[in-house]
Amino acid sequence: MKSVWLNLPVSNIQASKAFFKQIGFRENPMHAQADHMASFLIGENDFVLMLFPEYAFQHFTQTAISDTSKGSEVLINLDAQTRMEVDELADKVKKAGGKVFAEPSEVDGWMYAMGFADLDGHRWAMLYMEMDKMPK
């Protein structure tokens, strides 16, 4: 197996492209000029996020698209290097039109996390972990 990437359905490619750029995701230069899809590179290892119009995603998966207003199909986690990075992402998400469903806060005494929904309701979380405080 060479690599893994995440495909998500979106209702508006251009709006989603703008949202993910505004929150700091790096556009994948391989697909930067495409109008029928969008692609971003996330993190130090360039994890690939692919965004497809709902009709294309439905064709690929041969099933209905999840209604994100009624439930979550997945929670995508992003690893932060500092608490400040968590706070900054929450601010960027709000400014870009996303919904922060869990404000930045401490969790279990060793994590600092926030959660947000993108423009299509896909749920994401960012957390900073203080491993030296993690219960043994």
Language-model-detected regions and their locations in the chain:
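Vicinal oxygen chelate
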Residues: 39-40, 90-136
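A short, acidic/glycine-rich surface segment
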Residues: 57-63, 134-136
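Short, flexible turn/loop "capping" segments at secondary-structure junctions
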Residues: 66-70
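Mid-chain, well-packed structural core segment of small domains
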Residues: 74-93, 97-98
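Core segments of cupin and vicinal oxygen chelate
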Residues: 7-58
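N-terminal beta-strand motif that seeds the catalytic metal site of vicinal oxygen chelate
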Residues: 1-18, 73-78, 129-136
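Residues that cap or flank secondary-structure elements
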Residues: 7-8, 81, 108-109
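Alpha-helical elements of the RecA-like P-loop NTPase motor core of helicases
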Residues: 17, 59, 87, 124
